[in-house]
Amino acid sequence: MSTSTFATSCTLLGNVRTTQASQTAVKSPSSLSFFSQVTKVPSLKTSKKLDVSAMAVYKVKLVGPEGEEHEFDAPDDAYILDAAETAGVELPYSCRAGACSTCAGKIESGSVDQSDGSFLDDGQQEEGYVLTCVSYPKSDCVIHTHKEGDLY
């Protein structure tokens, strides 16, 4: 048995897909029979299959330089910049690889995983700076955007 623990504000989205052979009714003069319509392939078995996948979704609030706020849902497997664009929020960016500081922000609350980035040093990350192009949300978070100038 396995156990998973999630943050209390975490939302799980799931996809369930089932596949099974379809059946067709064929009427013969003496009986009504059901036959499975399955392509016959040597050495392959047909069976019901259940695929399940789940992902966590967090609330991300971005606060712009003029105090404007944008809140949207961001899955834990998408960069914050990409999730913002999907939600219709425009943010500055250049490299999309974590190698520059154009998309820099400063996290006020919450946590992110930005292990894909290489531009920010440990001290800047400890001060709360994030690169939205390579940051995955790991909890609900509030990030102040347009912070490239603060890094220098």
From Swiss-Prot:
Q: Which domain of life is it from?
A: Eukaryota
Q: Which GO terms describe its cellular component?
A: chloroplast; chloroplast stroma; etioplast stroma
Coiled-coil region(s): none
Gene Ontology biological process terms in this record = electron transport chain
Query: Where is the protein situated, by its record's location annotation?
Result: Plastid, Chloroplast
**Annotated 2Fe-2S ferredoxin-type domain residues:** 58-149
One GO MF term attached to the UniProt entry: metal ion binding
- The name under which this protein is listed is Ferredoxin-3, chloroplastic
Q: Does the keyword Transport apply?
A: yes
Cofactor comment text? Binds 1 [2Fe-2S] cluster.
Query: What's its job?
Result: Ferredoxins are iron-sulfur proteins that transfer electrons in a wide variety of metabolic reactions.
Which family does the record claim for this protein? Belongs to the 2Fe2S plant-type ferredoxin family.
Classification via InterPro entries:
2Fe-2S_ferredoxin-like_sf, 2Fe-2S_ferredoxin-type, 2Fe2S_fd_BS, Beta-grasp_dom_sf, Fd_pln
Q: Which organism is it from?
A: Zea mays
Q: Which PROSITE patterns match?
A: 2FE2S_FER_1 (PS00197), 2FE2S_FER_2 (PS51085)
- Cofactors that this protein relies on: [2Fe-2S] cluster
